[in-house]
Amino acid sequence: VKKTLSVFKLLFKWIFLVLGSFLFILLILSFTRIPYDVSAWLGKKSSRYTYKPDAIVFLGGSGMPSEANLIRLYYTSALAQKYPKAEIWIVHPKDTNVIADMRDELILHNVDSNRIHIEKLGTNTRDQALSLARDAHQLLFRKLVLVTSPENMLRSVKTFRKAGFRNVGGEAAFENAMFADLGFDYKKLGGRKYIPDVSSNLGLRYNFWNYLKLEINCLREFTAIAYYELNGWM
């Protein structure tokens, strides 16, 4: 019994050591721009295109309104204006209310309703690609541009190509930074003397947390990429 307990104690010790080291590395990286660069790489790698698309494919995966879907719809509507002859495809798991809201959002941004098509099947990227290939097989030989979050772009493009689509590019829905001085007068606002003054430390106030969130998104995506690779889906 003592030997078994000793083994478990050693095992837990190593687990906590590894997890602690991993979290420490994540915290250190959050003070650098590496998380942003990794996210940008995922959004741009394998997604470049030089053609005028025949179809713009919006890949949804959240409710409405939501940050993820609204920014993707923003990019989709911008592409729709840039390429007025392209069809618009909303690919989203079957939820008639959410899909209707997405369609209305595009129409609100001056996208002709006659250009909008719906694919309601598919609960993940692989399923969505196969469903679109089956239900709209004419798209297999046409020029596509996918719209999704930056972290999802690499996997999405490769998954659609694996599903048989010949020409697939992507437009990652990147957030744009706000270039404004967000510093403030700590004393003027009544800041207490024993509380640290971070009024001019934008890295700690914003960048650290944003990069920490990017790290989590990228880690989740690399896990998904590994899963798709092991299954031969991309």
Protein language model regions, located:
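N-terminal Lys/Arg-rich, disordered targeting/topogenic segments
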Residues: 1-11
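Extended, charge-rich low-complexity interaction segments
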Residues: 198-211, 216
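Hydrophobic membrane-insertion alpha-helices, especially the h-region
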Residues: 13-32
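A transmembrane-helix-recognition feature enriched in membrane-embedded lipid enzymes
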Residues: 37, 210-234
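A structural signal for short, hydrophobic/glycine-enriched beta-strand patches
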Residues: 28-204
